[in-house]
Amino acid sequence: KHVGPARKKMGKKTIFNLIGPLSSPAQVKRQVIGVFDKKWMKPFAEALKENNVVHAYIVHSDDGMDEISPFAKTNIVELKNGKINEFIIDPNDLGINSGNKDNLKGKNAEYNAEKIVEIYKGESNEFSQSVALNVAAGFIVSGKENNFRTETYKNWLWALNEGIGDPDAIIPPSRYERGRRNNRRNNGRIR
């Protein structure tokens, strides 16, 4: 909170953008971390390894985003069980049409809130694609899903497009029917 105003005044990325995720007092063991420059990906993975992180994706997209981009290939350095690997997620392989990252830029609070509501209501757009990609990554590193090739992204995009205002819709189809059966067995009671 003390360095924020100074960082903002500088107008560029600094070491503080990197220190935050590495110095979390929560000692998170599974996480997706975006970095502003590809050169920091491997050093980040090594630092997380030293901190006994179990599974992490360190991400940077070719269009400069510090998250998984629906518009360009995203470089990923994965730390899993002490081993570091690299791979690329290509949105074309996931059936995502090309677009422009500038379309994801926030504007004012009203506009940003409108886009969030659109995602909740199930509108299929670049915002929902971006959210689905990054949620899928989070579920992969959490151990709840295997990888992007097992339909993880498509399952989460489906869930978002169904409108997450419906509690059943946030469960990907691979688990959707199982949840419906359990719900019927419990006479509609939520446990």
Which residue ranges define each predicted feature?
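Glycine-rich anion-binding loops and their surrounding alpha/beta cores
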Residues: 1-173
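N-terminal low-complexity segments that are often proline-rich with Ser/Thr-Pro
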Residues: 169-191
